[in-house]
Amino acid sequence: VVLRISHALNGNAFAYNQDFTINGVTNYFTRLQYYLSGISIHHDGGQITPLNNVYVLASGHIKSYYLGSYTFNQVESISFDVGVDQAANAGNTVNYPSHHPLGPQSPPMDWGWPSGYFFVVSDGFTDSNNDGTPNAPFSLQALGNQMLTSIDPISVNPTSSNDTIYVDLIANADKFLHGLDLDAIGVDHSSSPSNLAMCNNALNMSVFEAGFINTSIENEPSRNFVHVDYTLPYAPTFNYHFNSTNQINLDIYGVDGKHIIHHSNLPHEGSYFPLKEFSSGIYILSLSNGKDKITKKYTVTQ
């Protein structure tokens, strides 16, 4: 079973640095991540199967999330919690491998312990002077067990291919921020009422709904992108997406042309964090799937 989440802004396909309007104000995201836990699949005439110990770390630029192998014939609906259940939130990232959603992440998805995981992270810029251009940074990162928000079962119309069931949801990312004065909030990494409202908006504002956004035809390069996340300026993370499902080759060069890193057979969408430590400077990132190629200049600041 694969959960496919099409993230949206004002009904259009999600993109970082893309303007959207909420509360009558123009904003854009530079980072959007959140956890899903307590997932249950309703199937085959009303049976309910909880997906125990299955966690999703969703990101605005990633669509597909593998939930596991099950003997379902017909999936009827899906329910889940936004955030991490209390038992897991009392754990620690060191208890999981790096590829696990609850394992160490870059940028971090936790505040250490006992504080626990960030349930929802919304970073970006908002228009503070009403000129239509987002200029003031905001960063809401919600933590605390009280942030856990249960989403009622969502009826779905899954598709099947090669013994895989695809469950399609739309996540209206802008609705996470409904009713929040982002300029006044600024930076808030806590269990505050603002962060609680952001998490509760997942239910109250129906952030999640059944369906998908048909952004473009397969292999169309116009939907390919890479976004550099500078949350850690000394160790940027690369969020990327290619519309084709071909595997990706990644290369990093110095501005002098020296080849520093090569990584092959990466998935067509994801986040890449170089394990190598880089000195301050300018670097060139290259991503290619054999047909389409993206190059991006970025900086490291130690």
Located regions from the model:
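Short beta-strand segments within Ig-like beta-sandwich modules, predominantly Fibronectin type-III
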Residues: 57, 263-268
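Residue-level detector of functionally pivotal "anchor" positions at catalytic/ligand-binding pockets or at interdomain
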Residues: 207-234, 243-245, 301
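C-terminal tail/sorting-segment detector
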Residues: 237-238, 259-262, 278-302
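Short proline/glycine-enriched turn/loop motifs at strand-loop junctions of beta-rich domains
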Residues: 34, 242-248
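A short, solvent-exposed, low-complexity linear motif enriched for acidic/polar residues
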Residues: 1-214
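Short strand-edge motifs at loop-to-beta-strand transitions and within beta-strands
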Residues: 63-65, 269-273
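Structural beta-strand segments of beta-rich domains
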Residues: 1, 234-238
